[in-house]
UniProtKB/Swiss-Prot annotation:
Residues spanning the signal sequence: 1-17
Protein location: Secreted
Organism: Lasiodora sp. (strain IBSP 8539)
One cellular component (GO) term of this entry: extracellular region
Tissue-specificity statement: Expressed by the venom gland.
Residues making up the propeptide: 18-50
Keyword Protein biosynthesis: no
Family classification: Belongs to the neurotoxin 25 family. F7 subfamily.
Post-translational modification comment from the UniProt entry: Contains 3 disulfide bonds.
Any GO MF annotation of the entry: toxin activity
The protein, known as: U3-theraphotoxin-Lsp1a
Tree of life domain: Eukaryota
Amino acid sequence: MKLSTFIIMISLAVALATWPSEHIEGSDSETKLNVELGPYALADRAEKGKDDSLNKGEPCQFHCECRGASVLCEAVYGTRSPMYKCMIKRLPISVLDIMYQAERALEKLASSFRCE
């Protein structure tokens, strides 16, 4: 009984982590900002969003800087000091790979408070 409860809790956590979040357009503070700054506010936010996220293979410091749900900032060894890059790992067995990618997405979600 305890194992089935644990499996249900894990599957619910994975489902919640992968569920797309909704963004409510036009909140009060965003509307005030747009009125004060005019067209520059939206352009600045769009440019900032493009520049902040990194692609695979680019150097990083935190998980939340990398683009993609299961792309994490991993240490790459080969020099004297480790270099951190945005990386994704794949497993050869598809069922295990799906579980591993969900685990990485949860890990990224848990560490996202550092970038805010």
